[in-house]
From Swiss-Prot:
Role according to the record: Spindle pole body (SPB) component that acts as the gamma-tubulin complex-binding protein of the SPB outer plaque. Anchors cytoplasmic microtubules at the half bridge of the spindle pole body (SPB) and accordingly functions in nuclear position and spindle orientation, including anaphase spindle migration into the bud. Recruits KIN4 kinase to both SPBs when cytoplasmic microtubules are defective, to delay mitotic exit. Links cytoplasmic microtubules with spindle orientation checkpoint (SPOC) components and, therefore, could function as part of the sensors of spindle orientation defects.
This protein's UniProt keywords: Cell cycle, Cell division, Cytoplasm, Cytoskeleton, Karyogamy, Phosphoprotein
Name used for this protein in its record: Gamma tubulin complex adapter SPC72
Gene name of the encoded protein: SPC72
Provenance organism: Saccharomyces cerevisiae (strain ATCC 204508 / S288c) (Baker's yeast)
Region (Disordered): 1-58, 221-263
Localization: Cytoplasm, Cytoskeleton, Microtubule organizing center, Spindle pole body
This protein's GO CC annotations: mitotic spindle astral microtubule end; outer plaque of mitotic spindle pole body; outer plaque of spindle pole body; spindle microtubule; spindle pole body
Length: 622
């Protein structure tokens, strides 16, 4: 739904549902010279006329479509005639007028094409104008619908709120309620009746309101006047005149009559004053009613004027459209006459050509009659042969047409087969696409897994590099520690053991990669460990024996020999036990070194394979 504002300040809406089924009725009424109804008649009797503006517009759109079809057919006919005229051969070389005829016909056809294009443009412009008119009509109808809705809302509000429950509100009698209900139940076509009823009720309500207000003000004025009269000296004289005895009334009768006459005059003046106060109220009331009536009349007159202007504009537009239709019909008639004349000229030209050809043949026959008499029989035979050939050619033509039809059928079947194959290929393509998509998803998953493995291997490589650096530091510290220990023990060791220790230390230091060649370094280190352990043990035992000999110098020599013998036995047993432990520990360390070396090689191979896979993936997916 499209909303827009028109210059008169009314808010209109344009619905897309244009009821275009009753166009012919409005156009018939316009053509027959019927008068357009006024605003009141159109709004109160719209249901009987069934909205005649919309069918006219629909009929015009149908006419436009039919005219466009006729124009296209005429253009096709003209093109066919032009091609036919262009392909007619110039059989008579002495007839140069055929080219001039074709040029003349071409010029006529071009002029007709220009007129057709101009008519098409005019039709499009009129179609746009009709659409704008239809939109304006719909907006006015929707505006009237909005007015009806507001009136219905006001009437329902009056019926619900002006009831007997509210004491201060205006009470509706039975007739007023019935008229309001009947007006509320009327359809949206009776806008003015609803407006009249609503305006009458509002006027009556305002009159009652002003009348009640004037009565209240008059009562208030009377009360104020009485209070003033009682407080004045005339009021006190009236009271004193009501209270005296009958004796005073009889004696002073004349005086009392004078006073009564004066008091009556005073009361008359007071009544005149009261009437003068009520006059402005009635004047205000009448003035308000007059202004309200004039405003309502002005509004109704404005609505009448707008409706009349709208109907006049529609009438002018439809008159223009009728004139345009007449012009188009005349142009089409002229075009059909031109086409008929072209056809007649074609037929006449073909007849003339045939006659010229026959005349030339007759002249030739007259000139060569003597020669043709001798060859007449041969010509007859040739004619018979030509007829036979013609029959044969017609049969061949029929067979060729049949063959062409069969070929067309075959081509149709072939096209259908190709379409089926295309559909099958489309299905296979979609299936293969799904398969490739699944494979791609799997490859993405594998790529993700390989990336994770590569990350884990990188982490392991970092850990191994840390282990390797730590091992190198540990090996260097261990060798320094062994050198320091050997320097300490060098004072009491033999030269052969010192040389052996130097060779082992040099061989250990000469190994390039200590972590990878751990199986070569491990036994040498273990031998150094055992060498140092035995040296320390012998030193400790000798030290202990020296301490014992120093503590007991008085013991006999025999006990000394026994003591020296027992430590030597213990030392030998200790050395044997240490040798066994050294051998078992060396074997265990060899096994551990071999296992760690195999594990390192497996990890390196896995790292290389993952690197190659990652390189291949980077090449395949740039």
């Amino acid at each position: 739904m499209v909303r827009r504002w028109i210059p008169s300040g009314r808010h209109l809406r344009n619905n897309d549902n244009t009821g275009d089924d009753d166009d012919s009725e409005f156009t018939n009424s316009m053509d027959s010279g019927m008068s357009i109804p006024s605003l009141r008649d159109s709004m109160t009797t719209r249901s009987s006329h069934n909205d005649p503006i919309k069918p006219a517009l629909m009929n015009d759109s149908n006419k436009v479509k039919n005219l466009e079809k006729e124009l296209t057919n005429a253009k096709i006919k003209i093109q066919v005639l032009y091609e036919y005229i262009r392909r007619i051969p110039n059989k008579d070389g002495n007839a140069p007028s055929l080219g001039n005829d074709t040029d003349f016909r071409n010029s006529i056809i071009e002029g007709l094409n220009l007129e057709i294009n101009k008519l098409k443009q005019d039709l499009k412009a009129k179609e746009v104008e009709y659409q704008d008119t239809l939109q304006f009509v719909q907006e006015n109808l929707e505006n009237s619908e909005s007015i009806v809705n507001t009136i219905n809302h006001l009437l329902s509000f009056i019926l619900t709120h002006f009831n007997e429950q509210d004491e201060n509100a205006h009470l509706l009698d039975k007739e007023e309620r019935e008229t309001l209900e009947e007006t509320l139940e009327l359809s949206s076509d009776y806008v003015l009746e609803k407006m009249d009823t609503l305006s009458k009720f509002i006027i009556q309500f305002l009159q009652d309101f002003l009348h009640s207000k004037s009565r209240a003000e008059s009562k208030q004025d009377k009360e104020e006047f009485l209070s003033l009269a009682q407080s004045s000296p005339a009021g006190s004289q009236l009271e004193s005149r009501d209270s005296p005895s009958s004796k005073e009334e009889n004696t002073d009768g004349g005086y009392q009559n004078d006073e009564i006459h004066d008091s009556n005059n005073h009361i008359d003046t007071e009544n005149v004053m009261a009437n003068s106060t009520s006059l402005p109220i009635s004047a205000v009331e009448s003035r308000f009613e007059k202004t309200l009536d004039t405003q309502l009349e002005i509004v109704i007159e404005n609505l009448h004027k707008e409706y009349d202007q709208f109907i006049n504009s529609i009438r002018l537009k439809f008159e223009k459209s009728q004139k345009l239709e007449k012009i188009i019909a005349s142009k089409l008639n002229e075009q059909s006459h031109l086409l008929d004349s072209l056809e007649l000229e074609e037929n006449s030209s073909s007849v003339i050509e045939k006659q010229d050809h026959l005349i030339s043949q007759l002249k030739e026959k007259i000139e060569s009659q003597s020669v043709l008499i001798n060859n007449l029989e041969k010509l007859k035979e040739d004619i018979i042969k030509m007829k036979q050939n013609e029959k044969v050619l017609t049969k061949e033509l029929e067979t060729q047409t049949k063959i062409n039809k069969l070929k067309e059928n075959n081509w149709d079947s072939y096209i259908n087969d190709l379409e089926k194959q295309i559909n099958d290929l489309q299905i296979d393509k979609s299936e293969e696409f799904h398969v490739i998509q699944n494979q791609l998803d799997k490859l993405d998953l594998e790529n993700y897994q390989l990336k994770n493995q590569l990350n884990t291997l990188d982490n392991q490589k970092l850990i191994l590099s840390q282990y390797e650096s730590n091992f190198i530091k540990f090996n260097q510290n261990l060798l320094l520690h062994l050198d320091s220990i050997f320097n300490i023990l060098q004072k009491i060791l033999q030269e052969s053991s010192i040389a052996q220790f130097d060779r082992k230390m040099k061989s250990i230091k000469s190994v390039p990669n200590a972590l990878k060649n751990l199986n070569l370094i491990q036994p040498k280190l273990e031998s150094l460990y055992t060498f140092i352990e035995t040296a320390l043990e012998s030193i400790i035992n000798s030290y202990i024996s020296s301490l014992i000999s120093m503590e007991t110098p008085e013991q006999p020599h025999q006990q000394g020999n026994e003591l020296t013998a027992t430590p030597n036995k213990e030392l030998t047993l200790r050395i044997e036990e240490l040798q066994r432990r050294w051998i078992s520990e060396r074997e265990r360390r060899k096994l551990d070194a071999n296992a760690s070396e195999a594990r390192i090689k497996a990890l390196e191979q896995e790292n290389e394979s993952l690197r190659s896979k990652l390189f291949n993936l980077s090449i395949n997916n740039p």
